[in-house]
């Protein structure tokens, strides 16, 4: 059992490092501070709340590594849902299988990957979102996702009339023994198999790396990290 709560580790990190750089897309000028990432997470949380997502609901993400991939991942876990990361080099059939087998409600995807998927084979999805700008690429009949996203700025102002600040970061309370991630590996036979990872698994990796990172950072303060 890891002493530090996985979700609270990130909640505290966003607060303490509010003005520092958090994510940068390689080869681009796009950069997010910890505070900006926390605000993007808050926007996605409002969407999840609007759609009545609950603890244990699954959200898949597939695409190249970028800031929005990380934001979708963090927004899912800090809301209390379960993230399902999918390798971007999986075939469309494998992606269809993983999304359906995991019973994912939402899918965040690169536009080019979505172009090669067949929405009629993803019967459980309520919404699909672009990792380029989080716009809605698909909503199931009867959903109001696209309409909500058009008014998201107003929803943010209504929820945070004084503006979003570090004091507004209050993520769900979830013990480390709960499943937070379904990891599908490339199967040697048939379709890929899913592995359930808990907060303890994830917190163990994070807490192990923190002392090593701090030691290196003190010696190399101007370095960037992948």
Please describe what each predicted stretch is.
Residues 2, 22-66, 70-74, 91-96, ...:
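Conserved AMP-binding/adenylate-forming core of the ANL superfamily
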Residues 38-44, 176, 195-218:
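Conserved structural elements of the adenylate-forming
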Residues 51, 78-157:
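Structural core segment of the AMP-binding/adenylate-forming
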Residues 185, 215-222:
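Conserved small/polar residues in nucleotide/adenosyl-binding loops
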């Amino acid at each position: 059992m890891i002493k530090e709560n996985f979700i609270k580790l990130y909640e505290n990190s966003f607060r303490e490092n509010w003005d520092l750089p958090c994510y940068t897309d390689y080869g681009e000028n796009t950069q997010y501070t910890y505070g900006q990432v926390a605000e993007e997470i808050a926007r996605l949380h409002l969407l999840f709340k609007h759609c009545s997502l609950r603890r244990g609901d699954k959200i898949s993400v597939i695409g190249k590594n970028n800031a929005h991939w990380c934001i979708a991942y963090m927004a899912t876990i800090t809301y209390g849902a379960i993230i399902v990361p999918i390798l971007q080099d999986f075939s469309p059939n494998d992606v269809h299988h993983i999304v359906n087998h995991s019973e994912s409600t939402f899918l965040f995807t690169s536009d080019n990957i979505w172009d090669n998927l067949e929405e009629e084979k993803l019967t459980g999805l309520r919404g699909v979102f672009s990792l380029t700008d989080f716009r809605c690429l698909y909503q199931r009949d009867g959903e109001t996702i696209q309409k909500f996203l058009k008014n998201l700025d107003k929803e943010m102002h209504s929820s945070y009339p004084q503006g979003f600040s570090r004091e507004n970061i209050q993520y769900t309370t979830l013990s480390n023994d709960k499943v937070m991630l379904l990891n599908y590996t490339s199967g040697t036979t048939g379709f890929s198999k899913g592995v359930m990872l808990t907060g303890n698994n994830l917190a163990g990796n994070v807490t192990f790396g923190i002392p090593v990172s701090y030691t290196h950072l003190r010696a190399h303060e101007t370095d960037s990290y992948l």
